[in-house]
């Protein structure tokens, strides 16, 4: 029987999840159908529950419903608990299960680039949900120190305080975006500047070996500046594929190879 999957969000037309999951299915022989579902801003829960009531096997959650999905789950994975957001849902024994595969997607993308994560010092620009979701997987993959920089310092400090309890083995620090300096192995842009077009200026006293832009398919001043410095860079398509592979694995027990889809 064909398994039914969907991605839910608002807006949703931009999602590439259906093409990815159908490509994984073709490669692995899983019989599935994967659709986009647009939910009204006030109608996530009813839309999600009706999908599972109709026999849906699994659902991906995108903006702006990840925090709501987290709140509705009966059972959460450790990484979802730390992220406080869920992008992957499934029903098991009548209970709604939730996971967050975004951080694992980022780690898989970085590893596919053969950028070392062991004992690294990483700078993440931005202190929003995207950053919260990737800290724990980065630490698990070997990152030694993670510095979170944000325009509003208090928000970065709050995030570090929250995560220190959840990820005690991590060396975490909060700074203001105005105080960017020092040497880092990898800089990750998790701000929405690449989406809104606000140019983010990286000062000369900030040095880094690699640059990763979480967004993809749009002009990015962050990537432009990495190019000017001749620093190896990548944008977020690999992360998108990586998080989709992890969700596919949770649902179907088969893990496609990331390199086959980049």
Swiss-Prot record:
Active site annotation, chain numbering: 66 (proton acceptor)
InterPro entries registered for this protein in UniProt: Aminoacid_DH-like_N_sf, NAD(P)-bd_dom_sf, SDH_C, Shikimate_DH, Shikimate_DH-bd_N, Shikimate_DH_fam, Shikm_DH/Glu-tRNA_Rdtase
Involved pathway(s): Metabolic intermediate biosynthesis; chorismate biosynthesis; chorismate from D-erythrose 4-phosphate and phosphoenolpyruvate: step 4/7
Record-listed NADP(+) binding positions: 78, 126-130, 150-155, 214, 236
EC number(s) recorded for this UniProt protein: 1.1.1.25
Gene Ontology cellular component terms for the protein in this record: cytosol
Keywords of the record: Amino-acid biosynthesis, Aromatic amino acid biosynthesis, NADP, Oxidoreductase
Enzyme kind, highest EC tier: oxidoreductase
Catalytic activity annotation: shikimate + NADP(+) = 3-dehydroshikimate + NADPH + H(+)
Function noted in UniProt: Involved in the biosynthesis of the chorismate, which leads to the biosynthesis of aromatic amino acids. Catalyzes the reversible NADPH linked reduction of 3-dehydroshikimate (DHSA) to yield shikimate (SA).
Alphabetical list of NCBIfam families matching this protein: aroE (TIGR00507), PRK00258.1-2 (NF001310)
Subunit structure: Homodimer.
Homology family: Belongs to the shikimate dehydrogenase family.
PANTHER family xref list: BIFUNCTIONAL 3-DEHYDROQUINATE DEHYDRATASE_SHIKIMATE DEHYDROGENASE, CHLOROPLASTIC, SHIKIMATE DEHYDROGENASE
This protein's name: Shikimate dehydrogenase (NADP(+))
Gene designation: aroE
């Amino acid at each position: 029987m064909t398994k039914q999957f969907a991605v839910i969000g608002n807006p949703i037309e931009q999602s590439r999840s259906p093409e990815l999951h159908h490509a994984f299915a073709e490669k692995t022989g899983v019989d599935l159908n994967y659709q986009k579902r647009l939910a009204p801003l006030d109608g996530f829960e009813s839309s999600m529950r009706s999908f599972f009531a109709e026999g849906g096997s699994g659902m991906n959650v995108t903006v702006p419903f990840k925090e709501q999905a987290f709140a509705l789950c009966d059972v959460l994975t450790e990484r979802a608990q730390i992220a406080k957001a869920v992008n992957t849902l499934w029903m098991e024994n009548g209970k709604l299960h939730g996971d967050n595969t975004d951080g694992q997607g980022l780690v898989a993308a970085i590893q596919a680039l053969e950028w070392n994560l062991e004992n690294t010092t990483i700078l993440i620009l931005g202190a929003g949900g995207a950053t919260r979701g990737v800290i724990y997987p980065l630490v698990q993959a070997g990152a030694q120190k993670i510095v979170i920089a944000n325009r509003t310092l208090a928000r970065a400090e709050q995030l570090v305080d929250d995560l220190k309890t959840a990820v005690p083995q991590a060396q975490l620090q909060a700074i203001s975006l105005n105080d960017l300096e020092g040497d880092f192995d990898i800089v990750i842009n998790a701000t929405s500047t690449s989406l809104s077009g606000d140019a983010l200026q990286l000062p000369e006293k900030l040095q880094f070996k690699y640059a990763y832009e979480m967004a993809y398919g749009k002009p990015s001043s962050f990537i432009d500046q990495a190019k000017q410095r001749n620093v190896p860079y990548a944008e977020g398509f690999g992360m998108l594929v990586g998080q989709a592979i992890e969700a596919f694995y949770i649902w179907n027990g088969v893990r496609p190879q990331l390199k086959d889809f980049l």
